[in-house]
Regions:
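A surface-exposed beta-strand-loop module
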Residues: 1-61
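Short helix/loop segments within enzyme catalytic domains
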Residues: 260-281, 320-329
């Protein structure tokens, strides 16, 4: 996207601006004192398209009958100029004009929907601050299906029965995770199912995006439905300051899968943890979970070892685990955290602080796989 014009409010005039290497550099007509607050208005244009990254092409993508946005971790600049770091949360107004009969689904509340000729203008507004990578726009020929008092699905009409079957327990999931983690942190929860298959589902703030391959009707992907929902607490409401700490998001999301399976009577969280521990034991032990590096940040070992870290802490704290976790999620709702903030809270609640420190260090900072937590 190309910046066309930049103006400032409550600041000297923007004398010159230059855009290169993903940065917009401004020169003001006069010096601005440190600490001065001001507003920038950036007018920009171009054709949204995916960005090539270490992890493949991400960002704005065309689908068979519309478009979608999946920006994690750095695809947001594919459709708007931004400080694309997870710590840069802001309030958003997202306004999209689409040809009829296309439906636009985005983050926050639908403020207005205005028809004009053969197009419709959709205006969404977030109530809570949001990280750039969580901003999304889904465009397609969708129908909407209620899944519960605070949950809704958007999908092509032809997929209705499969969607209602696959997401039949979505509201129960919201209620279950709310009992563990505290009230759901946004006004509602929506899922969008595209006609395209999509390799993996993705979370955005207040909604998640699934492909048609994820709704076979046999509940084979139920764990992923639980995983994406849990990100509304871990990652979306309480966000990361740096991507190196991604285990905090993904570890709790994977652990939530195990807790849901236990809730449904399919297995226990401990049995699920043991199963994944055994798989990890057959893989290379050559990454550090607390800082895996860009190439390995989405490695499944980071996800599962992060979840096993959470399981180990749960075993150490017992009943104090969820009490401490709920307090942390409430205190830091809609803000940005570092892992030490939660780990310090857990340490204070642990019966043996020295054992807690040793356990966390072994799981997060050492490459060798520690013994299974008993």
């Amino acid at each position: 996207m190309v910046a066309r014009r930049v103006t400032a409010k409550s600041a000297p005039r923007v004398a010159k601006f230059r855009q290169s290497s993903g940065k917009l550099r401004l020169r003001f007509a006069e010096e601005i004192a440190a600490g001065t607050e001001f507003e920038l208005v950036i007018r920009y244009g171009g054709s949204p398209r995916p960005i090539r990254t270490t992890w493949g092409e991400i960002g704005w993508e065309e689908t068979e009958s519309g478009s979608l946005v999946a920006s994690q971790p750095n695809g947001a600049p594919s459709w708007f100029p931004c400080d694309d770091t997870p710590s840069a949360k802001a309030l958003y107004d997202i306004i999209i004009t689409a040809d009829d009969p296309f439906i636009v689904v985005s983050n926050g509340d639908l403020v207005s929907r205005r028809a004009g000729g053969s197009t419709t203008r959709w205006h969404y507004r977030t109530r809570e601050p949001m990280a750039t990578y969580l901003a999304t726009v889904q465009v397609g020929e969708f129908s909407t299906f209620d899944l519960g008092p605070s949950t809704r699905a958007w999908a092509p009409a032809a997929l209705r029965e499969r969607v209602l079957n696959e997401f039949a327990q979505q509201q129960e999931m919201v209620d279950f995770f709310s009992s563990l983690y505290g009230p759901y942190p946004f006004a509602d929860y929506q899922v969008v199912i595209t006609e395209d298959e999509l390799e993996i589902p993705l979370e955005a703030q207040g909604l998640s995006i699934f492909g048609s391959k994820h709704i076979k009707g046999d509940h084979a992907f139920e764990r992923l439905i639980a995983h994406e929902l849990s990100h509304q607490w871990f990652g979306n409401s309480v966000g990361l300051g740096e991507w190196k700490d991604i285990w905090l998001n993904e570890g709790f999301a994977c652990y939530s899968e195990w807790l849901w399976a236990e809730h449904k009577g399919e297995t226990t969280a401990r049995e699920a943890a043991r199963s994944h521990y055994n798989v990890l034991g057959r893989k290379a032990q050559n990454l550090t979970v607390s800082d895996p590096g860009a190439r390995d940040m989405f490695d499944d070992r980071v996800y599962k070892r992060g979840a096993l870290t959470v399981h180990a802490i749960h075993r150490l704290l017992g009943d104090a685990f969820f009490t401490t976790l709920r307090s942390y999620l409430t205190e830091h709702q809609h803000s940005v955290v570092e892992p030490s903030m939660l780990l310090d809270d857990f340490r204070a609640a642990a019966p043996d602080a020295a054992l807690f420190d040793a356990t966390v260090d072994a799981w997060l900072n050492q490459k060798a796989l520690p013994p299974f937590p008993n």
